């Protein structure tokens, strides 16, 4: 049988052994194939990946891609595919009112594989952005339509991973709510047997108190923010409760954004052995192609590489870990035979690059992870002429 695509001479990252393996990758249709079962290694298309690292298609676990339904969202295929990202999780752009529109108009037709968190706010983030007429969402639990949220979740469990809440001072401080948005969201999630994803930047609670409400596989989003209550205590130590939470399976996602990353918090935590479980962008129209504070998942990955995080751990945080949380283990985030032929071919380049955090603090780096080609569902969707 003849291959459709053969990627030869590339190095594959062994996440368990922290080593590189010389391995050819074969594609037939939309699947990666076991080359031991192929008699003839001839292929319709051959990509010479010499000097490159062949990775599973990258997974951006936190972004906003309800393109056309919210003012802040990006077109996933345009922004993701040239940057090696073939799967994405939308972090609560839609609520129960507009989720079906999101699914029909964006999720279904997109090449990028998209799963989502359902916002507890009825209309999701549709009020954000749009200039002076935009406004923050109303997180008053009195307005949660629990029946409709449950109905939407139960009808779409193949796509919806859990409930999303933005729990920050600018949204809820001083509001006279009869009940707390976080406690109401947690209660509803437990009742519906699902997880939560909580935006914690400038949270209404200290991190060591907030984290008590998180279970295994709940998402602590923007874990390295430096606004208000961070994961560091007054002595600059990562709270013991935060470390314990990671041990019991709470997922800490950096979800960078333009307003959610602080070098001091990140470096201090990493020096103490506390690393993010997931590396993601929080892509929006504001921060994707318009600023280098985020720009792309590869740019954020490169920042962690220059902060000293192992390349193999970085790759795990954008492949294996998010694939499991998306309930797509073995399908994406892997180059194993039978998996979806989602592939990113990257090169580690030695070049000077500057990274900047929310507060304008800069890091001068000397390494960059650069995308050379992307395959999605077995199709070459981006490729440089020369690597």
Positions of predicted regions on the chain:
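Histidine-rich, glycine-flanked metal-binding segment
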Residues: 1-55
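Metal-cofactor-binding active-site regions of metalloenzymes
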Residues: 83-89, 93-94, 109-140, 164-167
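His/Asp/Glu-enriched, well-ordered alpha-helical/loop segment
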Residues: 265-348
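C-terminal cap of metal-dependent C-N hydrolases
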Residues: 340-386
